[in-house]
A protein has these predicted regions:
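Bacterial N-terminal signal peptides
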Residues: 6-16
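N-terminal (or domain-start) structured segment
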Residues: 21-116, 156-160, 170-213, 302-321, ...
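A structural signal for short loop-to-beta-strand junctions that line the ligand-binding cleft
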Residues: 89-92, 108-127, 151-153, 221-222, ...
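Periplasmic solute-binding protein
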Residues: 99-107, 121-135, 165-166, 170, ...
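A conserved helix-loop-strand patch within extracytoplasmic ligand-binding domains
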Residues: 114-155, 172
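C-terminal lobe and pocket-closing loops
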Residues: 210-302, 350-358
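Secondary-structure end/capping motifs
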Residues: 271-339
Length: 358
């Protein structure tokens, strides 16, 4: 019996080694499709990871980043769906914008995002802040809640900016009014000029642009979205550890914990807006052995001394999510429940938008 078990174990690991050995990208070129222009956040994410992935994939393949911007990321995303081969020679650079197109039912979407095979996710986080004259102290919304008019930027209700409308509604900012067509960068400039009352940024721009204003006393933190763990717990953002998370602020304002349909909506929004902010995906139907090889390369990459040294500055302080957990997050982000859609549509209607989540 012992001899049989020994033979079984040896045979099993030999078979595993054979399967891994069969995945070899020597002499091959991998095309990483990024549905945005060169120089944007998803582009920088791909180009930072590119040399490390080449280093740790078997055969050290050449990886070329292909930018296909247009249509709010739909042009490049549809191209990937229609042209990518499930043999490990195509990668997709996904972002919140790509996910929102699916989750909100954009009829132009042809890509089957929820069936793609995630290799890794790069979480990000949203910081909200206001001018110091509009808050009694940091993390205080009382003055903004009392105002009849609280202006903020909104690029389009069909983008991730939709989530701002939901957040402000849940916090009782009755005077909150979006200015459609104003991008995040344009909105921040308008904020600095005193033309709008509340603004937000992701991690990189928060550190680069907002923190200096906070240190000069011109701007104060309000809150962050929060870091959502695999168990559903929400922790504070290490870049602003004193700032409450959205669930904390919700409880402070409403006198009760975030729960039920509101909590479900928050988890879906958090998955799309934070946990899966940037990601590297393989096409649907990619064989498990190829997916495993990419994930193993990603695990080796994050332990590379050079990667560790440079990643915090290039990617932010949040650890990459690798493997099966990443797949569950992408599905949660891309498929909104009917109750979540109802909540989003209700706040859209309240703000007089004709656009509706499908």
């Amino acid at each position: 019996m012992r001899k049989f078990l020994t033979l079984f174990v040896v045979s099993f690991f030999s078979l595993t080694s054979i399967v891994s050995a069969e995945v070899d990208f020597a002499g091959k070129t991998i095309t990483w499709v990024v549905p945005f222009k060169e120089g944007g956040g998803t582009s920088r994410f791909a180009r930072f990871i590119q040399p490390f992935l080449t280093k740790y994939l078997p055969g050290n393949p050449d990886i070329q980043v292909m930018h296909i911007p247009g249509g709010g990321a739909i042009k490049g995303s549809n191209y990937f769906q229609e042209n990518a081969k499930a043999d490990g020679t195509f990668l997709f650079g996904c972002s919140t914008s790509v996910i929102v197109n699916v989750a909100t039912g954009n009829p132009l979407v042809k890509y089957n995002l929820s069936e793609y095979r995630p290799v890794l996710l790069l979480p990000q986080n949203t910081h909200w802040f206001t001018r110091s004259d509009l808050a009694t102290e940091p993390h205080d919304l009382s003055k903004l809640i009392e105002r009849d008019l609280v202006l903020y930027a909104l690029k389009t209700p069909a983008s991730a900016d939709l989530f701002h409308i939901w957040v402000f509604d849940k916090l009782g900012l009755k005077g909150a009014k979006p200015i459609p067509g104003l991008s995040s960068s344009g909105g921040y400039q308008a904020f600095l000029r005193g033309e709008i009352h509340i603004s937000s940024h992701g991690a990189a721009n928060y550190v680069k642009k907002v923190k200096p204003e906070i240190e000069q006393g011109k701007v104060v933190d309000l809150m962050t979205l929060g870091i959502i763990g695999a168990d559903g717990s929400v922790s504070r953002n290490p870049l602003a550890p004193d700032a409450p998370t959205f669930p904390e602020m919700y409880e402070k304002i409403n006198g009760k914990k975030l729960e039920g349909d509101d909590l479900e909506a928050f988890y879906s929004i958090g998955a799309a807006w934070s946990q899966a902010s940037k990601s590297m995906l393989l096409p649907e139907n990619t064989p498990d052995e190829i997916v495993d090889v990419f994930r193993e390369a990603a695990r080796k990459m994050v332990n590379d001394p050079e990667f560790k040294e440079k990643a915090s500055k290039a990617l932010g302080p949040f650890p990459l999510i690798i493997g099966e957990e990443a797949g569950e997050i992408v599905k949660k982000a891309a498929i909104f429940s009917e109750t979540t859609k109802d909540q989003l549509n209700a706040v859209l209607k309240k703000n007089r938008f004709t656009y509706q989540v499908q």
